[in-house]
Amino acid sequence: MDFLINKKLKIFITLMETGSFSIATSVLYITRTPLSRVISDLERELKQRLFIRKNGTLIPTEFAQTIYRKVKSHYIFLHALEQEIGPTGKTKQLEIIFDEIYPGSLKNLIISALTISGQKTNIMGRAVNSQIIEELCQTNNCIVISARNYFHRESLVCRTSVEGGVMLFIPKKFFLCGKPDINRLAGTPVLFHEGAKNFNLDTIYHFFEQTLGITNPAFSFDNVDLFSSLYRLQQGLAMLLIPVRVCRALGLSTDHALHIKGVALCTSLYYPTKKRETPDYRKAIKLIQQELKQSTF
């Protein structure tokens, strides 16, 4: 039901959140031609490019990202209002809400799995915190998929194997005769690259204890960009955890890094536990769990 939301806005939001024409066509139940026409019309009206087409994916321009940030809150409000004042006899569509830092590759896999299964869902992406999740799970017909674990809220935690594991980068000056000086590592902050913040820490803790003899590593979860992290690493101020696939993409030398295998990415699923369980919930959660378990990140 879209009697309040403009068609162009819905298509723009969907393409921003799926990054794919093929996925968007399944979500919106329309063919690719009308989607392309709407985006072309918008770009002509705005006199700005919205997306860059590359290898079957849509990369939003800076202009598109600015528009998205400004209109998304209004879109969420209108969508919630439609749900509230719509026909009461009609079953509300299940909402799948991804937090803003959830990996795009896994997000697309989940959307594809739900679409192929015939599950009718409304896909959304938004910034969340513990309070927002609590409100969503009390008032909306939704499942929130987050890269963060809010321990006070009951959730299902799914683990996805991380392809290649992660590399622990150690300052060059901490190496003696080709081996890390354990005494100098103790107490040195361990920074996380953005893609590694929601890895299962038990495996990483075990590596520090068994391999380096450090029982209480100084993990730091501050939001530090990659450039600043690499600078602190170079200056000997911190160690740095980066996924292997990111190292390959950036062409980083691993001469002064240790390989940690068996690492998994943790996904938390939040949903209204007090509501009467419905077939839609059971089916969607089972599909999401299965997809995350079988996939690699």
From Swiss-Prot:
Any one Gene Ontology cellular component term annotated for this protein: cytoplasm
Pfam families to which the protein is assigned, alphabetical: HTH_1
Residues covered by the HTH lysR-type domain = 1-61
Q: Which domain of life is it from?
A: Bacteria
Report any one BP term from Gene Ontology: regulation of DNA-templated transcription
Q: Which GO terms describe its molecular function?
A: DNA binding; DNA-binding transcription factor activity
Q: Which residues bind DNA?
A: 21-40
Which terms are listed as keywords in the entry?
Activator, Cytoplasm, DNA-binding, Plasmid, Transcription, Transcription regulation, Virulence
Q: Could you say which protein family the record assigns here? A: Belongs to the LysR transcriptional regulatory family.
UniProt name for this protein: Virulence genes transcriptional activator
Which organism is the protein's source?
A: Salmonella typhimurium (strain LT2 / SGSC1412 / ATCC 700720)
